[in-house]
């Protein structure tokens, strides 16, 4: 994005890319469908980003979610909106988005140097000297858009942090964000692969209750899925911890406890000769129902034998299934990275370094991170467009 907008501004642009092609991480976004952005307003984005929102406000006004959709329409990527407000290409292909961006770069005369990583950047007077392989390149301005340290197989290995630090920048310690969570409970392995389209997960952080909602999946060592990834953003600064963080999962958020009890009473009456795990099959998958019965101590109990306190226990487990979170999965498994270049050292109106004039930043390398749903790609587009559009020969 920076290359396109810089070229449109009249700059001669060279992109140094250590991979064989650019945009490899883009191919993973949205499960390969590329969740381009979210339909919210600028104020919605600012609110979601919390403390970082003020820093991002200007770039979002300069290149808003609506402007993003218009831009992609101009490069022949038609978009659509799902029921959650997430914006995808009509083709549902991240590969198409990658191709369109590279094709636009080609049309604008952007030069690419593939297969060469940047080993160092030094500033001599008004010029930068970039060491990349066998020869050095010189430039009047440099935009570092190397991403974070998550998904290193895509080339995102934290190289940009070292380059920025060598030029005087402060790096906020990188941590995994939007990442699966590891639990103390080993029974999660028995449920690995079982998912729920919608759950609500609640916990206490700094004496305040916080909740996230969305799809979830059990994994071999814990839990994953969009709701869990959003929760991980809130927990990553507290993990790993000496004492696990307790969370409660509402497996049936569409029903309150009274409605759930009423429904369950009807099921127990209708299927009085069945064991409880089989009675729960319309609410949760059979394996999950079996686990709930095991936790309630009623594995072999028939519906007709269920006592009131046992029924209350089942309802409690369906509405507040307890889990103890020990740690996040490694940063290599994270969708994005928390941390990076301190926003205090970047001019929010230009994305230019306050430490090293002529140096700019865009995307995940900056210390901002958002939830699932197109928020992080929008920040990549907005910071990239802003860093690029002010460049001139």
Stretch-by-stretch model annotation:
Residues 33-81:
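Glycine-rich active-site loop/strand segments that organize a redox cofactor
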Residues 14-16, 118, 136-156, 164-165, ...:
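Short hydrophobic core segments
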């Amino acid at each position: 994005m920076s290359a396109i907008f810089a070229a449109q501004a009249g700059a001669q642009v060279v992109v140094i890319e250590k991979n064989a092609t650019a945009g490899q991480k883009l191919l993973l976004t949205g499960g390969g469908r590329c969740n381009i952005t979210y339909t919210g307003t600028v104020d919605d984005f600012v609110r979601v980003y919390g403390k970082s929102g003020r820093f991002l406000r200007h770039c979002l006004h300069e290149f808003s979610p609506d402007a993003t959709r218009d831009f992609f329409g101009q490069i022949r990527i038609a978009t659509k909106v799902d029921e959650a407000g997430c914006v995808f290409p009509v083709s549902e292909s991240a590969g198409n988005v990658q191709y369109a961006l590279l094709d636009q770069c080609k049309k604008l005369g952007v030069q690419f140097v593939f297969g060469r990583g940047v080993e160092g950047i030094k500033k001599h007077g008004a010029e930068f000297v970039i060491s990349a392989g066998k020869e050095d390149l010189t430039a009047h301005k440099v935009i570092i858009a190397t991403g974070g340290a998550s998904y290193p197989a895509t080339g995102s290995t934290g190289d940009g942090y070292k380059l920025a630090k060598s030029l005087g920048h402060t790096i906020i310690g990188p941590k995994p964000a939007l990442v699966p969570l590891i639990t103390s409970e080993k029974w999660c392995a028995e449920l690995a692969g079982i998912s729920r389209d919608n759950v609500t997960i609640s916990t206490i952080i700094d004496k305040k209750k916080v909740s996230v909602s969305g799809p979830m999946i059990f994994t071999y060592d814990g839990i994953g899925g969009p709701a869990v990834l959003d929760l991980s953003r809130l927990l990553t600064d507290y993990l790993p911890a000496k004492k696990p963080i307790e969370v409660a999962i509402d497996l049936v958020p569409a029903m309150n406890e009274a409605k759930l009890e009423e429904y369950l009473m009807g099921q127990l009456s209708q299927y009085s000769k069945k064991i409880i795990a089989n009675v729960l099959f319309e609410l949760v998958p059979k394996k999950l129902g079996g686990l709930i019965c095991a936790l309630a101590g009623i594995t072999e109990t028939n519906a007709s034998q269920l006592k009131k306190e046992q029924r209350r226990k089942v309802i409690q487990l369906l509405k507040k299934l307890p889990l103890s979170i020990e740690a996040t999965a490694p940063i290599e498994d994270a969708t994005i990275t928390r941390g990076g270049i301190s926003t205090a050292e970047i001019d929010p109106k230009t994305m230019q370094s306050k430490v090293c004039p002529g140096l700019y930043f865009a995307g995940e390398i900056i210390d901002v991170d958002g939830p699932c749903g197109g928020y992080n790609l929008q920040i990549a587009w907005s910071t990239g467009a802003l860093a690029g559009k002010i460049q001139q020969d």
